[in-house]
């Protein structure tokens, strides 16, 4: 069963990883509708938390569109950053700094470089938008962290 086709995608990119617009292009090629795309600088934000405005926007979209219709795609460069972002959109903001503090959205979340997501993306688009980062990022560690949070916190 396809993960992305027909879904609403929230693309949360990382300045040092895969940027939001690149994630968006990949998602579109897999038949998803991108409803929000952003690129964060996780090392720039206080306490390493997800941007507070982005948390608010994700919360609004989940309420408006229904969590079951949304897939969050991350582009984080570091496994701990990916884990924090995945936890924020599943169980709630672990730093208790933003609108998702104590709010368990339970959204389905993946890293853009996870094999099951890569398999759904048009190979030419993936090559152009994301493949370069596979060579410099620890894909296995990123996938392990996001998968762990998905199993722990996703309701869908």
Curated annotation (Swiss-Prot):
InterPro entries hit by this protein: GRDA
EC number assigned by the record: 1.21.4.2, 1.21.4.3, 1.21.4.4
Top-level division of the source organism's lineage: Bacteria
Keyword Oxidoreductase: yes
GO molecular function, one term: betaine reductase activity
Active site: 44
Reaction it catalyzes: acetyl phosphate + [thioredoxin]-disulfide + NH4(+) + H2O = [thioredoxin]-dithiol + glycine + phosphate + H(+); acetyl phosphate + methylamine + [thioredoxin]-disulfide + H2O = sarcosine + [thioredoxin]-dithiol + phosphate + H(+); acetyl phosphate + trimethylamine + [thioredoxin]-disulfide + H2O = glycine betaine + [thioredoxin]-dithiol + phosphate + H(+)
Keyword list, A-Z: Oxidoreductase, Selenocysteine
Gene Ontology cellular component annotations, sorted alphabetically: glycine reductase complex
Presence of the UniProt keyword Oxidoreductase in the record: yes
One Pfam family linked to the record: GRDA
Family to which this protein belongs: Belongs to the GrdA family.
Job description of the protein: In the first step of glycine, betaine and sarcosine reductases, the substrate is bound to component PB via a Schiff base intermediate. Then the PB-activated substrate is nucleophilically attacked by the selenol anion of component PA to transform it to a carboxymethylated selenoether and the respective amine. By action of component PC, acetyl phosphate is formed, leaving component PA in its oxidized state. Finally component PA becomes reduced by the thioredoxin system to start a new catalytic cycle of reductive deamination.
Quaternary structure, from the entry: Monomer. Component of the glycine, sarcosine and betaine reductase complexes, together with components B and C.
Name of protein: Glycine/sarcosine/betaine reductase complex component A
Underlying gene: grdA
């Amino acid at each position: 069963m396809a993960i992305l086709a027909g879904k609403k995608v929230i693309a949360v990119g990382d300045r040092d990883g895969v940027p939001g617009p690149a994630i968006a292009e990949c998602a579109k090629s897999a038949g998803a509708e991108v409803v929000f795309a952003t690129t964060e600088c996780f090392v720039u934000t206080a306490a390493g938390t997800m941007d507070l405005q982005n948390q608010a926007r994700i919360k609004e979209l989940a309420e408006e569109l229904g969590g079951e219709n949304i897939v969050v795609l991350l582009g984080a460069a570091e496994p701990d950053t990916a884990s924090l972002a995945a936890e924020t959109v599943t169980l709630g903001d672990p730093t208790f700094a933003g609108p998702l503090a104590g709010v368990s959205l339970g959204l389905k979340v993946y890293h853009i470089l996870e094999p099951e997501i890569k398999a759904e993306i048009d190979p030419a688009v993936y090559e152009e938008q994301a493949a370069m980062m596979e060579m410099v990022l620890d894909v296995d560690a990123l996938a392990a962290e996001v998968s762990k949070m998905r199993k722990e916190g996703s309701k869908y």
